[in-house]
Structure formats: structure tokens, C-alpha cells
Amino acid sequence: MPKRKVAASRGGREEVPKRRSARLSAKPVPDKAEPKAKALAAKDKSENKKAQSKGKKGPKGKQTEETNQEQIKDNLPAENGETKSEETPASDAAVEKEEVKSE
């Protein structure tokens, strides 16, 4: 049979040892989540730099020719004598309201 501990035989309760010394307890406990957050932020920055460098480069070869042709087509007047209007024509109701306001 195992022997009993001396403190248990006295009827008293043992003191639980402190996990941290008084010197260490004066300092706040560091969070473990912070280093991970900084590491993720560093990855995001590197991805942003890659995206910026890719964005600065223009299309090459045939892609450039195609985009130039599309821009030229957009700038040309419409076929069959039709004209493109930037402004939409006013509706009848809107015209009537303007007439009433001007009176």
C-alpha cells in the first residue's frame, strides 16, 4: 500500500505551487495570435506588390493589336448614318415638367 503524504496526514491542504514567479507575473502575458497576424500581413503586402507589377505591364503582341482595333471602332461614327448620342433623349413627361417649371 502506498504511503500517505505528510501534509495530507496533518489534515491541512497543500499549497498549489505558483506557475509564474513574481518577477514574471509583473509583465503581461504575450499573445500568441500577434505573430501569426504579422506573418499574414507580410504575405498580403508581397501579393499586393506582385499585383501592382503585373498591372503596370501592358498586353503584348496580338492582344495589343486587338485592343487598338476595338478602341478605333468605338471612336468611329456608327454605320448607316446613325449617330451615337452620349445623352439620352428626354422623355415626354420630363419635358412637360420643365415647361411647367419655366412658367
UniProtKB/Swiss-Prot annotation:
Keywords: DNA-binding, Nucleus. This is Non-histone chromosomal protein HMG-14B. Coiled coil: none annotated. Belongs to the HMGN family. One of its GO terms (biological process) is chromatin organization. It is found in: Nucleus. Residues 51-60 have a biased composition (Basic residues). Residues 1-103 are annotated as: Disordered. GO terms for cellular component: chromatin; nucleus. Binds to the inner side of the nucleosomal DNA thus altering the interaction between the DNA and the histone octamer. May be involved in the process which maintains transcribable genes in a unique chromatin conformation. Residues 29-50, 94-103 have a biased composition (Basic and acidic residues). GO terms for molecular function: chromatin binding; nucleosomal DNA binding. It comes from Gallus gallus (Chicken). There are two HMG-14 proteins in chicken: HMG-14A the major component, and HMG-14B the minor component. The keyword Nucleus applies.
